[in-house]
Amino acid sequence: MWIGVISLFPEMFKAITEFGVTGRAVKHNLLKVECWNPRDFTFDKHKTVDDRPYGGGPGMLMMVQPLRDAIHTAKAAAGEGAKVIYLSPQGRKLDQGGVTELAQNQKLILVCGRYEGIDERLIQTEIDEEWSIGDYVLTGGELPAMTLIDAVARFIPGVLGKQASAEEDSFADGLLDCPHYTRPEVLEGLTVPPVLMSGHHEEIRKWRLKQSLQRTWLRRPELLEGLALTDEQRKLLKEAQAEHNS
């Protein structure tokens, strides 16, 4: 099995390639892990890999160009048939059933986010699937990527002496994140939502909240059951549901 990794900290993956069961799998050529660092695709002397989000707010997003070029390079190295996965809190929860599905792929490319995440248009144009290891926040996608690699590697013939099962984690309640956008304003014909460039902070706040509610309703509706929504949240959720069903 071949796995490509896009990460600002490729050295972290020595934990996978040099130690334990996965390290032995790499040594015996049952598993191959290759890494690409977006910093290697920058053009400025500071090797900048972050950029400001449209609409303001705390934190930064990963810069589009270096990340996009790294993904394209990994795709070229993989050839046909590689599935590109973004490790994201907004993704499908990784459980044993999901691991079994992913293990059917001979080639995977794992994109590890940092900062506040990546531009939504990169997800739309470059990513095949989003996966999450749980409803909590980490500083980056590297640990989720290593979790996925470790879990999937167990299904590679010859890696384990016998087939094994893993326990599923429990998850906390909460809303999923809203889409994020950074430069450029237009990417492959897809534009940043005008509200994020309007400068109207209250409208931006409402848009982000509404997007979060809609995503949670569409992707993880069970999370809403344990939340005591405010009057504003209920109103925005009803609007989002009406727009989606119209």
From Swiss-Prot:
Its EC number is 2.1.1.228. One of its GO terms (biological process) is tRNA N1-guanine methylation. It is found in: Cytoplasm. CDD domains: TrmD-like (cd18080). SUPFAM superfamilies: alpha/beta knot. GO terms for cellular component: cytosol. It catalyses: guanosine(37) in tRNA + S-adenosyl-L-methionine = N(1)-methylguanosine(37) in tRNA + S-adenosyl-L-homocysteine + H(+). The active site is at D169. The keyword Zinc does not apply. Pfam families: tRNA_m1G_MT (PF01746). S-adenosyl-L-methionine binds at Y86, G113, I133, G134, D135, Y136, V137, L138. One of its GO terms (molecular function) is tRNA (guanine(37)-N1)-methyltransferase activity. It comes from the Bacteria. Its main location: cytoplasm. Keywords: Cytoplasm, Methyltransferase, S-adenosyl-L-methionine, Transferase, tRNA processing. Disulfide bonds: none annotated. It is an enzyme of class 2 (transferase). Homodimer. Belongs to the RNA methyltransferase TrmD family. HAMAP family: TrmD. Specifically methylates guanosine-37 in various tRNAs. This is tRNA (guanine-N(1)-)-methyltransferase.
